[in-house]
Amino acid sequence: MKKIYKEQYRQIGLKIAYYRKLRGLTQEELAEQVGVTPAFIGHLEAPNISKALSLDTLFDIATVLEVPPHKFLCFEDP
């Protein structure tokens, strides 16, 4: 049975937005440094969209934002 992790992806996106803003980066700047499109970052951060991403991309984002990857994977109950 395949489980859909919509809420977890939403929380990851909100954390990406939080740490990106904390570092003073725009979505465009983060996208350029990670090697993805600004639209991809926008979709990740949108609270009403559950966009999946690979661990490689998550690790790249964590590296650019200087945040340990596990910070993105600690979830609150919905």
Name what the model sees in each region:
Residues 1-11:
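A detector for short, charged/polar N-terminal pre-domain segments
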Residues 14-33:
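Short basic helix-loop element that most often maps to the first helix and adjoining turn
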Residues 16, 27, 38, 55-58:
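Helix-turn-helix DNA-binding elements, focusing on the entry/boundary residues of the two helices
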